């Protein structure tokens, strides 16, 4: 088995999918998991990007079905901007599409800035823009878990195969969640699910960005990665990609393994 095949298997990627079937499987997963845990529903941060829009709509469909079947579940969508979000219009469009039971907004700027100032005062140096970006992601995680803890809700994560293979998420930030309904999907497969669900094309054709950096607001994921999502998707779907692209992907996969594992102990061997 080639490394490419090993990665596809490890990340549960299917080269070809039926969007209708995948939607059904993922809604059922959300329903089954919330029933099994006894939780009261879900909470998810909505950025206006493809991934949170898709996960949010799947969550809302799941809680509606649970209620139609005589159960009780709710979904809270959370906006978590740092000051003014450049693409706020897209976030509002996503909320309109998702139709969450409840939507709330937390501006994380005061919390992030207070922490950054305290860090500088105590340690005598400023946080790098990169590390401050990770603080933003982790404050968003803390906010979602605070809501989840108060309301008895599970925190949904938006990680999918194209992020998992590169480790392109903040450990214990957007990587911190209770369940991941998009696991196994490539970026283009996620787009296909949104198309099937009737989303406005603006929500899945827009340039993906983590938007965590003050110095480079709205920087494209592909710029930071040095790899396009089409190349990632081709690789994950078992297609041929240029040798240098495959090497980049496989190197990122190897060095980011710690992000896909629980914290290491001396009894684990995945890191050796």
Curated annotation (Swiss-Prot):
EC number: 6.3.1.5
Summary of subunit composition and partner proteins: Homodimer.
CDD domains, per database record: NAD_synthase
Protein name, entry field: NH(3)-dependent NAD(+) synthetase
Function comment: Catalyzes the ATP-dependent amidation of deamido-NAD to form NAD. Uses ammonia as a nitrogen source.
GO biological process: NAD biosynthetic process
Chain positions recorded as Mg(2+) binding sites: 51, 163
Record keywords: ATP-binding, Ligase, Magnesium, Metal-binding, NAD, Nucleotide-binding
Record has ATP-binding as a keyword: yes
Listed InterPro entries: NAD/GMP_synthase, NAD_synthase, NH(3)-dep_NAD(+)_synth, Rossmann-like_a/b/a_fold
Pathway of action: Cofactor biosynthesis; NAD(+) biosynthesis; NAD(+) from deamido-NAD(+) (ammonia route): step 1/1
Binding-site residues for deamido-NAD(+), renumbered to this chain: 138, 171, 178, 258-259
One Gene Ontology CC term in the entry: cytoplasm
Keyword Nucleotide-binding belongs to the record: yes
One function term, GO molecular function aspect: NAD+ synthase activity
Residues noted as binding ATP in the record, renumbered to the chain: 45-52, 158, 187, 209
UniProt-listed Pfam families: NAD_synthase (PF02540)
PANTHER family: NH 3 /GLUTAMINE-DEPENDENT NAD + SYNTHETASE (PTHR23090), NH(3)-DEPENDENT NAD(+) SYNTHETASE (PTHR23090:SF7)
Reactions catalysed: deamido-NAD(+) + NH4(+) + ATP = AMP + diphosphate + NAD(+) + H(+)
Gene designation per UniProt: nadE
């Amino acid at each position: 088995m080639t490394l490419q095949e090993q990665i596809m298997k490890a990340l549960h990627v299917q080269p070809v999918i039926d969007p209708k079937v995948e939607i059904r499987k993922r809604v059922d997963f959300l329903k089954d998991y919330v029933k099994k845990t006894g939780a009261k529903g879900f909470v998810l941060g909505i950025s206006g990007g493809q991934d949170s829009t898709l996960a949010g709509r799947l969550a809302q469909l799941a809680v509606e079905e649970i209620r139609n079947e005589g159960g009780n579940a709710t979904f809270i969508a959370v906006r978590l901007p740092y000051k003014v979000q450049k693409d706020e219009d897209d976030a509002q469009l996503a909320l309109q599409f998702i139709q969450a039971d409840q939507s709330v907004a937390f501006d994380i700027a005061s919390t992030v800035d207070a922490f950054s100032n305290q860090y500088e005062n105590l340690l005598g140096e400023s946080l790098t823009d990169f590390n401050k970006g990770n603080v933003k992601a982790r404050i968003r995680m803390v906010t979602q878990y605070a809501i989840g803890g108060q309301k008895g809700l599970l925190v949904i994560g938006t990680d999918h195969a194209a992020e998992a293979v590169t480790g392109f998420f903040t450990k214990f930030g957007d990587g911190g969640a209770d369940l991941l309904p998009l696991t196994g999907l490539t970026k283009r497969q996620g787009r296909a699910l949104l198309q099937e669900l009737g989303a406005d094309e603006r929500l899945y054709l827009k340039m993906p960005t983590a938007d965590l950096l003050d110095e480079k607001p709205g920087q494209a994921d592909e710029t930071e990665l040095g790899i396009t999502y089409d190349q990632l998707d081709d690789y994950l779907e078992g297609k041929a990609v240029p040798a240098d692209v495959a090497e980049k992907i496989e190197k990122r996969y190897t060095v980011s393994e710690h992000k896909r594992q629980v914290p290491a102990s001396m009894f684990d061997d995945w890191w050796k």
